[in-house]
Every structure is written in C-alpha cells, then in structure tokens.
Amino acid sequence: MWQYIPKIERTIKIPPSMMLQSWMGSDFTNDDMVKESSLEEDYHAKLLSKKGNIATIELIPKEDAAVVWGKIIVTVDIKNAVPVTETFYDDMMKKVRVMTFSKVEQHGSHRVPMVMELRPLDASKKKNRTKVIFEEVNFDAKIDPSYFTKQALKRYSR
C-alpha cells in the first residue's frame, strides 16, 4: 500500500509493520482498507450454528497464512448473502473488536450493507466507534487505470 504525504511531498510505501496502525485516525487499520488476506484462501471455515436465516461461522487461520487475526467469528444473513457481524480475536484469542453491518440495499445484482460500524473492545477505546456510511455505490463505474498509480496519489491529493 502506498500513501502520498503532502507535508513532505513524498509518496511512501506503508511497510507490513504499519498495516495494523490506524487508518486516518479511525478505528479501522491500514490492513482493513486493503484486505490483504482472503478469508477463503487464508482461513479454515467451520459452521458453528444456523438459526433461521442467520449462520455463525468460525474462521481460523491456515498454518501458513500471513494474517492479523487469531480467529474471526462471522454471522451471516444467508437470505441476503451479507455479513451481519464480524468479531475479531487476537492471537491469544482475546476478543479485540466487533464490526456490524446494516442498512442492506440492492444495487444491481449486489446486496450491499450501506453502513459498517467498527467498535474496538480495548478498555482504553471502549467509547470509540468508527462508522462508514456508503451514500452511493456503483459496481459498473468505468475508472481509468491511470487512477491506480503512485503518480495519481499526488495528483488527486490536493
């Protein structure tokens, strides 16, 4: 992941050691923004329960996976094929944070939770919350590939 810093007028690569740091002062991490890991490729999934349209799935990292979390518990709305909650555990199996998804809307062939709220569980951050609200989504947008270059970071930062 790359970041342009206007103050020093430089584009820097964010090293792996910084991927767990806060993204723009929020409760999200840099890793959350790039989703380096793939749940399907990096985790073993086990169905814990199914009640009506809600399934609870436990995700345990595969032995060779370079992932951040020791375990993730996901509740999924089966009917709409969207997450309801994700509970993240560290490598000591301590519950670290909970993300909730709400306001599911249909956009073309996609069902999308338009609100994501991340709540850290650390005692020093108990009152923190970061909410992301999608006002509009477009899955068919035509985006010029040049937008995804390091040069574009500087060009669009002002």
Question: Where are each of the predicted segments found?
Answer:
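A surface/extracellular/periplasmic glyco- and lipid-processing/surface-interacting theme
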Residues: 25-32, 40
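Gly/Pro-enriched, hydrophobic low-complexity segments
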Residues: 21, 31-34, 52-148
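Generic alpha-helical secondary structure signal
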Residues: 8, 32, 47, 93, ...
